[in-house]
Amino acid sequence: QTGQAHYESVKETARVALEKNERRYRYKPYGFLNPLALKMAAGAADLVISRAGSGSIAEISSWGKASILVPIPEDVSRDQRANAFAYAHAGATVVIEQGNLTPNLLLSEINRLFTNPKARIDLADSAKKFAKKDAARKLAEAIIETALEHEG
């Protein structure tokens, strides 16, 4: 998922970069995926590479997927770095800070996770444990309880 604004440039860059790759048909950029389509795409993935927004981490953990997170730099978004490292501390992801991100480093981490299935499975298992499956219900109950306490 590239975002609509970047879709055409990512599509063209991928076409050129993957032109001679026999697996190029497996790469499918999308400008936007609705929540159901995103969940279905994630279901087919063994590894998710994403930014580190709280919504992204919540989705990845609910899917129980191994991930590599690249947080937006702190000068742009202070919370993404903290989110990423909290998730990594739970054993659920690999973090590559944007300033350290190179194609070789990213490819090295991807290869490491695919040549070491146990590492990938451990990340996925930790992601499942991190997920708060009933968070929406608990939040709604807390809001209702607070509202009832202040009813007046």
Where are the regions a protein language model picked out?
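A donor-sugar binding/catalytic signature common to diverse glycosyltransferases
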Residues: L38-Q80
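Receiver (REC) domain switch/output surface
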Residues: E109-L113
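A short, well-ordered alpha-helix in the C-terminal region of glycosyltransferases
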Residues: A119-K133
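Hydrophobic beta-strand scaffold residues
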Residues: S67, V94-V95
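Donor-nucleotide binding loops and adjacent catalytic segments primarily
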Residues: Q1-V48, R81-F85, H89, I96-L105
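Short histidine/acidic/glycine/proline-rich micro-motifs that form metal-
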Residues: A5, I72-D75, K129
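C-terminal alpha-helical cap of glycosyltransferases
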Residues: K132-G152
